[in-house]
Curated annotation (Swiss-Prot):
Family of this protein: Belongs to the methylthiotransferase family. MiaB subfamily.
Name this protein carries in UniProt: tRNA-2-methylthio-N(6)-dimethylallyladenosine synthase
Bound cofactor: record note: Binds 2 [4Fe-4S] clusters. One cluster is coordinated with 3 cysteines and an exchangeable S-adenosyl-L-methionine.
GO cellular component, one term: cytoplasm
HAMAP family per record: tRNA_metthiotr_MiaB
Entry EC number(s): 2.8.4.3
Species: Prochlorococcus marinus (strain MIT 9303)
Domain of life: Bacteria
Length: 480
């Protein structure tokens, strides 16, 4: 839905907004963006920050000093959604004494709630779903004209028109596919992010070439279900397969000069193919790190979740990855206490975590979400069970992660320096190819100083469950 509310109420056609040129008026105010949730939201926030800066806004030093406050929201868990309402309440009270404040809610909560948000928080100026991130300037033009705007209609996502204001100068998110066509029974994403929309390989490569020209060294290709990339694009090869797949995209962008590392997330076991695994092995820039959610280690629970694969298939994927890339890191997402999950089924999840030996696990207790089948089921588990199972899982995850990291003690790992350690300014921090957070001294042998963007060989001398520390060696590859 797209509505623009004034006095009297007026309905503004979506097509008019999409085709009218955006305003060129320059704003002198400041903005603040608070991002909740996934990497897709972070990438959307970077694009919206770029749009605001192109409009003449500048970033405020603090949220309570901003003339425009934008919350890019997440609805994947109830606690994230409630946090948003807490922030909004504070800003709504502020607006009563600062009437020129613009208050914007973007992202998945905006898409889910739509006009209901205006009824709950009438101080809002703009409610916009994630498909409208690139339309921010045109939407704010309506706000400048004194209207309250709700933009939650299912739209084709415009190609990026404004340079994103990146939070990093080293590593960049690159959206390659938006939306999700899966129908997992617990997940609200398809209803708030819409159907899959793949960007063209040419547009993606052009963006990456621009990033390389600006000095970026690492890119992460993003999608809610990135292995589905290209399903909506035309073209069939002589062999009868789709012409545009994630595997083809990796080959298409691999030779962009200046980009040293390529990652991608998030994968779905249902679409993670042998051909993709072999491409990751063959292409030297693709990092040996794979984020593949398994959600549950029990086949009956997976069936209830409508995930479309079995534990056996997941094992085959992991085994093949490690057959070709023995040191590859595998991270995952897990949900415990799904409706009806028994003690034995939960134990199957624990068993799989230990068997696979995950390097990192994003854990969560099941949270009923609006407009999802699982939220309506009668076999919901009590909160005390959720808390206890999550506690058990987290303890196991930390133990397994420490075991995995212990293998690196004494080894030399190549680290891409991303910035200064905020707790120890004399240190830099970065990540290995396997995505391990690593800290090391900014000054190396023979008074050599390292900078963000350098690729530094670091000898690991201390390991923790979720980070490594070490000493720089002589070898380094400068960013410049």
């Amino acid at each position: 839905m797209f509505r623009s509310f004034a006095s009297p109420l007026a309905l503004v056609a979506t097509s008019a907004l999409a085709t009218n040129p955006a305003t060129t008026a320059q704003h002198q105010g400041s903005f603040w963006i608070q991002t909740f949730g996934c990497q897709m939201n972070k990438a959307d926030s970077e694009r919206m920050a770029g749009i605001l800066e192109a409009m003449g806004y500048h970033e405020a030093p603090a949220e309570l000093e901003a003339d425009l406050v934008l919350y890019n929201t997440c609805t994947i868990r109830d606690n994230a959604e409630q946090k948003v309402y807490s922030y909004l309440g504070r800003q709504a009270r502020r607006k009563r004494t600062h009437p020129h404040l613009k208050l914007v809610v973007a992202g998945c909560v905006a898409q889910q709630e739509g006009e209901a948000l205006l009824r709950r928080i009438p101080e809002l100026d703009l409610v916009m779903g994630p498909q409208h991130a690139n339309r921010l300037e045109a939407l704010l033009t309506q706000v400048d004209n004194g209207q309250q705007v709700v933009a939650t209609d299912d739209n084709h996502i415009l190609e990026d028109l404004t340079t994103a204001r990146r939070d990093s100068t080293i590593c960049a998110w690159v959206n390659v596919i938006y939306g999700c066509n899966e129908r997992c029974t617990y997940c609200v994403v398809p209803s708030v992010r819409g159907k899959e929309q793949s960007r063209s390989p040419e547009a993606i490569r052009l963006e990456i070439e621009g990033l390389a020209a600006r000095g970026f060294r690492e890119i992460t290709l993003l999608g809610q279900n990135i292995d589905a990339y290209g399903r909506d694009l035309p073209g069939i090869t002589p062999e009868g397969r789709r012409q545009n797949t994630l595997t083809d995209l990796l080959h298409h962008i691999h030779d962009v000069e200046g980009i040293e590392r390529i990652r991608f997330a998030t994968s779905h076991p249902r679409y993670f193919t042998e051909r993709l695994i072999e491409a990751c092995f063959d292409l030297p820039k693709v990092c040996e790190h794979f984020h593949i959610p398994f959600q549950s280690g029990d086949n009956d629970v997976l069936k209830a979740m409508a995930r479309g694969y079995t534990v056996e298939r997941y094992r085959r994927i992991v085994n093949r990855i490690r057959e070709l890339m023995p040191d590859a890191a595998i991270s995952t997402d897990v949900i415990v206490a799904f409706p009806g999950e028994t003690d034995a089924q939960f134990q199957n999840t624990l068993n799989l975590v230990e068997e696979v030996g995950f390097d990192q696990v994003n854990t969560a207790a099941y949270s009923p979400r609006p407009n999802t089948p699982a939220a309506t089921w009668s076999n919901q588990l009590p909160e005390v069970v959720k808390v206890e199972r999550l506690k058990q899982l987290n303890a196991l995850v930390e133990r397994v992660a420490l075991q995995r990291n212990s293998r690196y003690s004494g080894k030399v790992e190549q680290v891409l320096a991303e910035g200064i350690n905020p707790k120890k300014p004399q240190q830099l921090m970065g990540r290995t190819r396997t995505n391990r957070l690593t800290f090391f001294a900014a000054e190396g042998p023979q008074s050599c100083r390292y900078s963000p963007g350098d690729l530094v060989d670091v000898q690991i001398n201390s390991v923790r469950a979720f980070s490594l520390s070490g000493t720089p060696c002589d070898q380094t590859r400068s960013r410049h």
